[in-house]
Amino acid sequence: MSNTLFSLAFGVGSQNRQGAWLEVFYAQPLLNPSAELVAAVAPVLGYEGGNQAIAFSNAQAAQLAEALKGVDAAQAALLTRLAESHKPLVATLLAEDAALSSTPEAYLKLHLLSHRLVKPHGVSLAGIFPLLPNVAWTNQGAVDLGELAELQLEARLKGELLEVFSVDKFPKMTDYVVPAGVRIADTARVRLGAYIGEGTTIMHEGFVNFNAGTEGPGMIEGRVSAGVFVGKGSDLGGGCSTMGTLSGGGNIVIKVGEGCLIGANAGIGIPLGDRNTVEAGLYITAGTKVNLLDENNELVKVVKARDLAGQTDLLFRRNSLNGAVECKTHKSAIELNEALHAHN
């Protein structure tokens, strides 16, 4: 067995009455843990290689804490706490970044993103949806939907209320980790698996999906859909939209470059280069016909928006007299044609 792992984490989670995992919380996930640490934990867990989620007991947690005292003080301290747990424990060891095969593995990779250990598209999430059970997220934690009605009745009979915040496959990120240096006005609008860079502010209308996020700093008042990554210094205006890779965006990875502004209620279905501006209310899809204007506001040619994907210093606007979508640049007609030719 190799002592090299892609990732390792010790977690505490929730299971339904059949013992199936509903969710897992990893306080201190590790990316590329040291060979010494792997060698210390493998015999205690009976790990012999591959990608595995191994349930372990409180007694094993204490053993692991002892084994790691001289190797990794932070992990040893965590395991000392886990040894006192009244909830089920699991160690997830990933030898490689491969397609997912269990719920604890899926939760570990979502944690890696939200802990900023990997960036969106930096880890394989293939097969994630069937492994994330649809769960009632309540003020008493994750509840299996088949067990919810009974628990609601039990709570009422005690004079209590079991409040259901959402019914979803993904929990909110802040119940698992709050990254340093961020503001999130409505935490329910950021899913676990979002990457929120330092200096990011997400206002009430902002939303960030899993495997998506921001480099930071930046202001998010619109929707950052699955797979979308927003560069530093960019501003997404109120109610604006970025087309995700899950619905409508196909396999095109939509990216927002640095220093961009997407106006209120605008939207993009193409990747933006640096310092692009999209006028409020204008939605650009890949097939949108665009009048390309040069530095003198002269028409150079009519192109599809996808031909302008990734180009820098563009202003997308709608002509209020004739409704045509225009792209204004600071370049000459010759420079524009060269840029388009290079892009193709």
Curated annotation (Swiss-Prot):
GO BP, one annotated term: diaminopimelate biosynthetic process
Keywords: Acyltransferase, Amino-acid biosynthesis, Cytoplasm, Diaminopimelate biosynthesis, Lysine biosynthesis, Magnesium, Metal-binding, Transferase
Biological or metabolic pathway of the protein: Amino-acid biosynthesis; L-lysine biosynthesis via DAP pathway; LL-2,6-diaminopimelate from (S)-tetrahydrodipicolinate (succinylase route): step 1/3
GO CC terms, sorted: cytoplasm
Keyword Transferase: yes
Catalytic activity of the protein: (S)-2,3,4,5-tetrahydrodipicolinate + succinyl-CoA + H2O = (S)-2-succinylamino-6-oxoheptanedioate + CoA
Compartmental location: Cytoplasm
The protein's name: 2,3,4,5-tetrahydropyridine-2,6-dicarboxylate N-succinyltransferase
Catalytic residue positions: E221 (acyl-anhydride intermediate)
InterPro entries: DapD_gammaproteobac, Hexapep, THDPS_M, THDPS_M_sf, Trimer_LpxA-like_sf, Type2_DapD
Annotated EC: 2.3.1.117
Residues engaged in binding Mg(2+): E205
Pfam family, one: THDPS_M
Role played: Catalyzes the conversion of the cyclic tetrahydrodipicolinate (THDP) into the acyclic N-succinyl-L-2-amino-6-oxopimelate using succinyl-CoA.
Assigned protein family: Belongs to the type 2 tetrahydrodipicolinate N-succinyltransferase family.
Record: residues binding succinyl-CoA: R223, G238, S241, A264, E279, A280, G287, K304, R317, R318, N319, S320
